[in-house]
Amino acid sequence: MVSRIEDVAQAAGVSTATVSRALRGLPKVSDSTRAKVLKAAADLQYVASPTASSLASGKTHVVGVVVPYVTRWYFAHLISGASEVLREQGFHVLLFDVGDEGPHRALLLDSRMLFKRVDAVLILSLRLHDAERELLRRLNVPVVTVGVPDDDWPCVRIDDYETTRQATEHLIGLGHRHIGYVGGDTVPSMDFPTPADRARGFRETMQRHGLTVSAHSVVMGDWTAVSGREVGRELLARPDRPTAVVAASDELALGVLAAARELGLAVPADVSVIGIDDHEMADLNGLTTVAQPVVEQGRMATQLLLSAVAGHDLGHEVATVPTRLVVRSSTAAPPASAAAVAEPVRASAR
């Protein structure tokens, strides 16, 4: 027989209203009373009806999280940070993994969001289409984005341009003049701004120092270590290979490290490698990187979102989270022979 809230109230010796408040973690319930209610609910294996709770409060305590890829490192860590805050505050996650849905993406969101009501929506590193914007306006719930600034909603992000500027400046400061770049391809249906911003940070930093970026010193992968290994081999097997490589992510950089080993190149004696992110595997592999606090970005964005759910007006604030250079063993000065023939470097204007 399924237990009812009345059964819990009778067992705990309190009213049904007190049971409801105690189970929802609301104030004005003493610790001893809350403990009695929780014990009675556990003994009776009582499960509160989410439908009834939402009807009473007008809230579902569900937050929709829209993400392009669930399994990739960056997105998984954003979700981890968001889930941690939501769990602490008694909210549940409704995950929308849009993958490579392309033109069907808006339909996927529409069919799931409208029929499974959410109190707010968190958008993770995704530029929204017009149809998706209209859907969110119709839902009339708070929205916060991560990674992609938006004119309509608050955003938590890093400065992607700055990450590759920091990485490139580090290598130039060590004396490197012939620097290659391993970038991440843009998925057309996703329209990520990150690939272009990071590539621009590399190119413009090189230009400010008067250094050449040749066409064959830039290769593109798909953000994975496997891809980094493939394009890294292409870059490092050239007779005029670079003495250092900036990779647009740590996973790409880890692939470049593997490619260097396979080609018999010593890191950093023959080639220096730097990534971006501070992936857990970066430390294990001695990878120098520009670290970004991914889990913390997920936490910050979710805290903003719940503040909006509570009625606070957030405006269109953009919170830019700082990144930092973490120097490990994968970067050093170039070989003496390379340094001797290197082109002169201009001081950066920045």
Task: Set out the residue ranges of the language-model regions.
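Hinge/beta->alpha junction and helix N-cap segments in small-molecule ligand-binding domains
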Residues: 68-77, 96-105, 156-166, 182-233, ...
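N-terminal helix-turn-helix DNA-binding module of bacterial transcription factors
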Residues: 1-61, 74, 335-350
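Short acidic capping loops at alpha-helix termini that bridge into adjacent secondary structure
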Residues: 177-178, 213-217, 267-272
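Alpha-helical recognition/docking segments in bacterial nutrient-uptake
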Residues: 3, 62-169, 173, 350
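Periplasmic-binding protein-like
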Residues: 65, 115-124, 180-182, 218, ...
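Short beta-strand segments enriched in small/hydrophobic residues
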Residues: 18-20, 56-71, 170, 178-188
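Flexible loop/turn connectors
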Residues: 232-350
